[in-house]
UniProtKB/Swiss-Prot annotation:
Recorded GO MF terms: DNA binding
Lineage: superkingdom: Eukaryota
Gene: MYB1
UniProt tissue specificity: Germinating seed and apical meristem of shoot and root.
Function comment: Possible transcription activator in response to an external signal. May be involved in the regulation of flavonoid biosynthesis.
Protein name: Myb-related protein Hv1
Domain HTH myb-type: 9-61, 62-116
Keyword terms of this UniProt record: Activator, DNA-binding, Nucleus, Repeat, Transcription, Transcription regulation
A cellular-component GO term for this protein: nucleus
DNA-binding feature ranges: 37-61, 89-112
Gene3D superfamilies listed in its UniProt record: Homeodomain-like
Amino acid sequence: MGRSPCCEKAHTNKGAWTKEEDDRLTAYIKAHGEGCWRSLPKAAGLLRCGKSCRLRWINYLRPDLKRGNFSHEEDELIIKLHSLLGNKWSLIAGRLPGRTDNEIKNYWNTHIRRKLTSRGIDPVTHRAINSDHAASNITISFESAQRDDKGAVFRRDAEPAKAAAAAAAISHHVDHHHRSNPQLDWGQGKPLKCPDLNLDLCISPPIHEDPMVDTKPVVKREAGVGVGVVGLCFSCSMGLPRSSDCKCSSFMGLRTAMLDFRSIEMK
């Protein structure tokens, strides 16, 4: 349920207040105080709504109301309060004695907004208008910097392709030079020879080593070349087919010796 109306609208006057109504309302409030605005019109003998009586008293008939223009100090106070409170005109009016919220609101919209704009200040945010433009310029420059970074990335991506193209050109030039001068080669005209290695696999039974006996093979070296392990003939040490004179040990026809290729020591 909503609030009941403060008066009967059928028996109330509307429109501008007359001087007689102002005098009657002023005399009643001076004698009895403000009291309840719902019952005040009937007690004062006025055919007005309680809300209309309240607004007429607060905005026009109060004895402490200030008449005339706003001072420079009041202008600065209104600007400072508006920057803190915003459009809460009733709170701003409470800090300016003798001024009403409706009066301050009208004065703000007609005078103070223009004054702040002429100073280069935004009347809504109370910040310099030039700073807003500077912020937009900073945003634009930041976007351009991002574009530059992307362009730099594209350039860095293109550098490996250029390096590969340069390497291909150098390789083509070297090949062409070798074809035109066949005598100039890395081996000075001599073909490179790979050492002959015996890649045949041999299977040998497991060897049981005595921990008390040194099992290191004895290698015979002649003129810096390893001949083989003692106990192997020359043919077996070089991986050649066995001759009729081979007396190397064997087990069920399987060779039990390991080959020694040039006695290479692996560390």
